[in-house]
Design a protein with these regions (language model features):
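Substrate-binding/catalytic cleft of secreted carbohydrate-active enzymes
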Residues: 254-257, 264-497, 501-508, 512-531, ...
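Secreted/periplasmic carbohydrate-active enzymes, especially glycoside hydrolases
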Residues: 1-268, 277-279, 283-287, 308, ...
Length: 615
C-alpha cells in the first residue's frame, strides 16, 4: 500500500529448505543457508508502493558441503517454503527486525529463588535515518492476569545509522516460579518504543522465572528441586505432510508427548518451529534445542554451523523451557576438525548465552573421546540389542560409566529399537540384526521394558531420551521391509497407532490411570503355552482368558509390570480381558488372540519374502 512508503519492509521466513534466494521485482533481496532457522530479508528498496510486486523464492534442498547437515543420511531435509512467511513493517526507528530474525529483545535472569529474582531486559534499537532521534523505551513485566508487576522507562537520543542496546534491570520479590509441568507459570515482558508519546514499535516476549542446575551423579534440578527428566525425542515430519506442518499437527504431537508423561523433549536434530517452543513454555516441558550438525563433516561447514547456532540462540533466547543448546550429534570424523568445530560452537554459545548449558552427543559409549570433551554435558546414544551387543548390556555399561567417570554430567540421549507393527512374533532373542527385513514390534517392547527399568535405577544418568516419539523418514534407507522409514517411534509415522512401548512409558511416567494388555497386534499366536503381560499403574489387575480368571501373577521389571506365565491357550479364538476397580471406577481392556497350531512367524515371513519378494 502507498501508506507504507517511507517505512521499512521485511519478509520474514520461518523455514525454507535448505538454500533460499529471495527476489523482489527481479532484484536479489537476500539469500539464506539452512532449512530450519528463520531469516529476514529487508525489501524496502525493491518494493513498488501502491503497485503490484513480484516475489520469487528459489529453494534448493540438495545437500551442500557448506550447509549443515552436509548429507541427508539421518533424516529427510524437505524442500520449499514449509513454514509461515510474514510481512513485517516498521518505522525507520524500531526494535531491530533483522538481528538474525530474532525478536530484538533478550531477557536474562540471575539469582533466582522463591524470595527474589533479578531480571534484565535488553532491547536492540535500530535507526536507519541520517539524524539523531529522541525516543522513549518502556519495558514492563505483567503477570498471567495482565496485572503490571514492574515497569521501567528511559529517554535517549538514538544515534543515526546504527543499532544501540538499552537495558532495564528489575528485582522481583517473591516471584511465581516456572516449575515445569507442575506449574508452568509465565509472566510477559512488553517492550514499547515511543516517539513523542506515540508507540511506534512493540514486542511481547514470555518470561518464565526459573533456575536450571545439573549436578554430576545427582541429577537435574529445577529451582533447587530434583526434577525427573523423563525424555522423548521428536522429528517434525509427518506421513503425507513432510515438514510442512500447521499448528494443528504441532499441537497433536505435543498432546501425545504430554499424554505419555514425558517431562523433557529433545527436538532433534535441528531447530523446530518457534510455535512448538512457545507451547512448551506454556505446557512446562523442559526442552533441548539443537542445530543439524550431524553424522559427517565436509570441512566446508564451519561458517554455516556457527550461523545456524547463532540464529537458533537469538531466535529462541527467551523461551524459558529451553535448558540446553545441542552442538552436534554423532559427528565422528575427522576427530581433530570435529573437536575444534565443537569447541568453537561451544564458545559461541557461551558468548551469546552464558546462562544455558551446551551438549555434544556421540555413540562411542565412553566419555574421554575428544569430540565430546568440549561441551558442558556428555550425551551418548546407545542401542544395546539393536546396533550393538544385547539388550541387557545397558546395565554393565551404565555401571562402568558410574565407576570410571563419576564427575561427568552424562545423559543417555538416544536408545531403543525399530518396530514395524505389521511384524509380530513371540520368539525373541536378546539381540536383533538391524539389517534384517523383519522388525517385530515385540522386540521393541522387550527392549524398552528392560532398558527403562535399568535407567530408572541409576540417577547417575541425568536425563534419558527414548528414540523416538514418532516414526520418521530416512530417505536413503530401507528398514524392516519399508522404504525410507525409521520405525523406532512410539507411534507410527501417520500418528494413527500407538505401539505397545507407548503404553509402557505412559504406565511408568504418567499420573493418568493406565490398564493395558500388550501384544494386541500379535494376534496369531505361535505357542500354545504363552505369557500375558499387563501394564497397570493403578494396582494388580485381574485377567481372564475366555471368561476364566487367571492366577499366578508376578511383577516384572517395574511396579507397573504384571506377567502371567504358562498360560495355555485354547485352539482357535482366545479372548483376554483385564479389569481393575480403582477409586470407585472400573477399568477394563480386552484383546483377541488366535491359536491354530505351532508356527514361527519370522521364518514364515522370510520364506515368503524369499519366494515373492514382498509380504
Amino acid at each position: 500500500p502507498e501508506n507504507m512508503e517511507g517505512k521499512r519492509i521485511f519478509l520474514r521466513f520461518e523455514g525454507v529448505g535448505s538454500y533460499a534466494e529471495v527476489y523482489i521485482n527481479g532484484y536479489l533481496a537476500g539469500t539464506h543457508k539452512g532449512a530450519y532457522s528463520a531469516f529476514a530479508c529487508e525489501i524496502s528498496s525493491q518494493v513498488k508502493f501502491g503497485k503490484e510486486n513480484e516475489i520469487i523464492v528459489k529453494a534448493d534442498n540438495s545437500s551442500r558441503p557448506d550447509v549443515i547437515p552436509t548429507n541427508h543420511i539421518l533424516f529427510g531435509v524437505y524442500g520449499g517454503i514449509y513454514r509461515p512467511v510474514w510481512l513485517v513493517v516498521t518505522e525507520t526507528c524500531s526494535i531491530i527486525a533483522n538481528d538474525c530474525a530474532s525478536p530484538g529483545v533478550y531477557i536474562t535472569q540471575k539469582n533466582v529463588s522463591k524470595k527474589s529474582a533479578e531480571v534484565t531486559v535488553k532491547v536492540k534499537v535500530d535507526n536507519t535515518t541520517l539524524t539523531p532521534v529522541p525516543l522513549e523505551l518502556e519495558n514492563a513485566i505483567y503477570d498471567r492476569n495482565g496485572k503490571l508487576v514492574k515497569k521501567h522507562s528511559q529517554n535517549f537520543e538514538l544515534t543515526p545509522q546504527g543499532v544501540q542496546n538499552y537495558s532495564s534491570h528489575f528485582r522481583l520479590n517473591n516471584p511465581h516460579l516456572w516449575q515445569g509441568r507442575e506449574d508452568p507459570y509465565l509472566y510477559k515482558v512488553v517492550s514499547r518504543l515511543m516517539q513523542n508519546g506515540r508507540v511506534i514499535d512493540e514486542v511481547i516476549q514470555p518470561l518464565g522465572i526459573r533456575k536450571y542446575e545439573i549436578v554430576a551423579g545427582k541429577g537435574f534440578f529445577l529451582n533447587g528441586k530434583k526434577y525427573p527428566m523423563l525424555g522423548v525425542t521428536r522429528h517434525q515430519d509427518w506421513w503425507g505432510l513432510g515438514s510442512a506442518l500447521t499448528n494443528k499437527e504441532h499441537d497433536f504431537d505435543l498432546a501425545q508427548i504430554m499424554d505419555i508423561g514425558a517431562t523433557t523433549v529433545r527436538f532433534a536434530h535441528y531447530q523446530q518451529s518457534d510455535y512448538i517452543y512457545s507451547r512448551c513454555d506454556t505446557l512446562g516441558l523442559v526442552i533441548w534445542a539443537e542445530i543439524p550438525f550431524v553424522n559427517r563433516v565436509s570441512g566446508q561447514e564451519w561458517d554455516n554451523a556457527h550461523q545456524q547456532m547463532r540464529e537458533l540462540i537469538r531466535q529462541s533466547f527467551n523461551h524459558p523451557s529451553i535448558y540446553v543448546w545441542g552442538i552436534h550429534n554423532e559427528v565422528y570424523h575427522p576427530h581433530g576438525y570435529t573437536a575444534a568445530l565443537t569447541q568453537s560452537i561451544h564458545d559461541l554459545c557461551k558468548l551469546e548465552d552464558p546462562d544455558r548449558y551446551t551438549v555434544a552427543v556421540n555413540g562411542y559409549g565412553h566419555a574421554d573421546h575428544p569430540v565430546n570433551q568440549n561441551a558442558d554435558i556428555q550425551g551418548m546414544n546407545r542401542y544395546f540389542g539393536w546396533y550393538e551387543r544385547k539388550i541387557q548390556d545397558i546395565k554393565p555399561w551404565i555401571e562402568k560409566m558410574e565407576k570410571e567417570y563419576p564427575w561427568q554430567r552424562l545423559m543417555l540421549t538416544e536408545y531403543g529399537a525399530d518396530a514395524n507393527i505389521e511384524h509380530q512374533t513371540e520368539i525373541l532373542g536378546d539381540a536383533l540384526n538391524w539389517t534384517s527385513p523383519f522388525y517385530p514390534e515385540t522386540f521393541q517392547t522387550k527392549t524398552h521394558e528392560y532398558q527403562w527399568s535399568i535407567i530408572a535405577q541409576h540417577p547417575y544418568i541425568i536425563a534419558s531420551y527414548l528414540w523416538n516419539m514418532f516414526d520418521f523418514a530416512v530417505p536413503t534407507s530401507k528398514r524392516g521391509s519399508v522404504d525410507a522409514r525409521n520405525m523406532k517411534g512410539m507411534m507410527t509415522f501417520d500418528r494413527r497407532i500407538k505401539k505397545d512401548s507407548y503404553f509402557w512409558y505412559k504406565a511408568n511416567w504418567s499420573k493418568e490411570p493406565v490398564l493395558y494388555l500388550t501384544q494386541r497386534r500379535n494376534a496369531v499366536r505361535e505357542k500354545k503355552e504363552t505369557s500375558i503381560t499387563v501394564y497397570s499403574n493403578i494396582g494388580t489387575p485381574r485377567v481372564y482368558l475366555n471368561g476364566k480368571e487367571l492366577t499366578g501373577v508376578r511383577k516384572g521389571y517395574t511396579d507397573v509390570h504384571y506377567i502371567f506365565d504358562k498360560v495355555v491357550l485354547d485352539d482357535g479364538k482366545n479372548v483376554l480381558k483385564a479389569s481393575l476397580l480403582h477409586q470407585g471406577k472400573e477399568y477394563t481392556d480386552e484383546i483377541e488372540w488366535n491359536y491354530n497350531g505351532e508356527c514361527n512367524r519370522e521364518a514364515d515371513f522370510l520364506e515368503h519374502k524369499k519366494e515373492h519378494g514382498s509380504w
